[in-house]
Amino acid sequence: MEVTKLDELCIQTIRFLAIDGVQKANSGHPGMPMGMAPAAYVLWTRLMKHNPANPRWVNRDRFVLSAGHASMLLYSMLHLTGYDMALDDLKNFRQWKSKTPGHPEYDPQLGIEVTTGPLGQGLGNAVGMAIAEKYLASQFNREGFPIVDYKIFVFAGDGCMQEGVTSEASSLAGHLGLDNLIVVYDDNHITIDGKTELSFTEDTARRYKAYGWNVIVIDGDGNDIAAIEKAIQKAKRYKGKPTIIKLRTHIAYGSPNKQDTADAHGSPLGTDEIKLIKQNYGWDGEKTFYVPDEVKEYMLRTKDAGQKAQKKWDRLFKKYSQAHPQLAEQFNVAASGKLGINLDEILPKFKAPGAMATRKASGTVLNALMPRCPLVLGGSADLTPSNNTRFEGAKDFQKDCPEGRYIRFGVREHGMGTILNGINVSGLLRAYGATFLVFSDYMKASIRMASLSKYPSIFIFTHDSIGVGEDGPTHQPIGHFAALRSIPNLLVFRPADANETAQAWKFILENRNGPAAILLTRQDVEIIDQEKYGKAENVSKGAYVVVKADNPDCLLLATGSEVSVAMKACEKLAAEGIRAQVVSMPCWELFEKQDKSYIDSVLPPQVTARVGIEAGVELGWHKWIGSKGIFIGMSSFGASAPAKVCFEKFGITPDKAVEAAKKLLNK
């Protein structure tokens, strides 16, 4: 394929928009956009199936800029190809409430598929997107009707390659043979510190071959668009393996003084350098944010091509609807974001008396729900028997079984988190992943990205306290409740018993407005009698009265397994003539959203004698118990001993709660 002057002009325009945006903001990363402009041009205008007129088209190819610092490259492409990204938006780069923040933030209506920036997150998301496409294709495609057949394209950099999460996600992608995933690796040999040889000398091509990937290497300077197009076309046709294209590029390509230097990575090039670059290409060095008319006209043809592609798909789907009406209806329901079932009809109800670990209750709930929820996937980071996450009759999602709904993530917690986020942004699927709560630390970045972006990801964390017992302090979470609650937009559920667990699942599945974490016990907890005490349905309000007291003397507030501690303490206090009201607080975030009248009905403001009980650190509790309240919990790491002994030795007992209440009441 011959490179035309118009091709060159388009590529130059992409480069110059990117560096002008960074320069105007006096902040940003100009180097990678300059080096990767040819690859972006070829992919977006010739190879990627997308419709700028309808960015949410369900069968579009997905583009993920895993190296999110190169955001001006993405924004420039969105503008030039006709998305809702005006030239003024590029001029507003990195400014307050602009469409163009420093790193891309999830906005599918703008064409931004995922939030990226922390390196490696995007590549992990892309693996999840590829899993979603494979599963959806297995469910809905029929002979002659490939209604789901999109690809996932990723631009990743040297930093992405160094992050551990990239190794986790890439390893699993190779194992699963995700041949719908294509990564273009910007091999520019530069990081913030300097040349990559300072710390990164491995053979990435051989590494990815070992992962089970198809590897294509393009040497040179990153400007051979014919070679790039050929490589991507080959990758699109390749079967059985994901593909990585190792593209040798030069950071800040065309900059006389800063090409191939670390200075070009994360700082503006400077007005003088930009003038030199533009003049060397025959441009007016004084003009900024300039798009030649012929470039504008040519690149906007992408929009026309996208509309034609979608119209072709629409015609196919119309025929599909006639040939397979039931499947088409299911597809449309899924695309609307609805479950399509009444959860109240199938949720299990648990009778008292009895006891059950909430992780086992969660497993029972999944066994009831999953046969009726074919668009929910799940898995575990190699803790399936402990997490109770594999439902009866489940098939594993594997290379030769894309219809499987259970994902074996392996010991890859961080990778699991990023992959879950990728599945959950598909728009049609929900996905959960599980590990021990103490290992949520390994995946914190992915939980944070889900919360920032409001992905409806579901994180199951079992073994949630010193109730872990004999495994000891290495596996007993202490500060994790507080750490998760500190993340904005994350709903943290810690149910008190089996029925609260079922109601937590109901709320999570019915709400797609953001992520949720559900924290579950290893040890058995008593089932609260629904006929005698407060109803578990009130989990949807975040907190509720379990044991009601008229004109209470004190309040006992608790979460999870400690609600039963509070209830036993209440009985002991009643025997001494002290009226205690017990409050279960399974989700603080939901409780905070209730109106004042409801909050005051649960926590009467006139009752200041309050005891908080939770097998974690005190942080955050004084919002509920007040400055004079007493907290019963953990102030140190745990210990290796049976769970019952741990609770006794650390003083999380009914007797200690009684003692605290009496102290507050001066009795």
Label each region the model flagged:
Residues A25, D61-R62, I112-T115, E143-E163, ...:
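A short, small-residue-rich loop immediately preceding and capping a beta-strand
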Residues V58-N59, T243-G340:
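Terminal amphipathic helices with adjacent charged low-complexity linkers/tails
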Residues M36-L176, R390-F391, I419, I423, ...:
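Cofactor-binding active-site loop characterized by glycine-rich and histidine/acidic residues
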